[in-house]
Amino acid sequence: LAGDGLGKADLTCLENLLKEDPSNKFLSTVLARENQHELCVLARKFPNLMIFGCWWFVNNPSIVEEITRERIELLGLGMIPQHSDARVMDQLIYKWAHSRQIITSILVEKYSILLDSGWKINESEIERDVEKLLSNNFTHFLSS
């Protein structure tokens, strides 16, 4: 299948595409742990890049948590935490179940840090943030 591969990627090619054609929009995810930070930096530098989901082969809960946490810490809500690249329905069901738990856990931790610092958070702000992560980021990215 297109895009299935192993090992660390050279993201220079992606960086060149982003730089040379800022009017084109790119959705990207990478396989190697070693590429995750570099991909986040590219997403901060180039508004025409949206990071989305975790590649099928890194779909272990501990790795999904690590990647999602890193992306939220570097990009805030400016990414799509999970997508379906499931090839059969039963993969989709279990993938979403553990991804949802991970996203929830990370958001609860981040909101707790804000509350501990004296920041006031209301239910509508949490709903807004979740809608961004699970729906609106994608729609906004394509329409901007």
Report residues per predicted region.
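Divalent metal-binding pocket/active-site signature
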Residues: L1-N35
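Alpha-helical structural signal in soluble globular domains
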Residues: N16-E20, V41-K45, L74, I102-I113
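His/Asp/Glu-enriched short active-site or ligand-binding loop at hydrolase and phosphoryl-transfer sites
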Residues: M50-P61
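Histidine/acidic-residue-rich catalytic or RNA/ligand-binding cores of hydrolases
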Residues: L1-K8, Q36-K45, P61-T68, M89-I106
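Residue-level preference for long, well-ordered alpha-helices that form the structural scaffold
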Residues: L6, N60, E123-E127
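Short acidic/histidine-rich active-site segments
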Residues: L27-L31, F52-C54, L75-W96
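Glycine-enriched alpha-helix->loop->beta-strand junction motifs that scaffold or abut catalytic
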Residues: E20-N24, R44-I51, L77-G78
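Mid-to-C-terminal alpha-helical segments outside catalytic/metal-binding sites
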Residues: L77-G78, Y94-S144
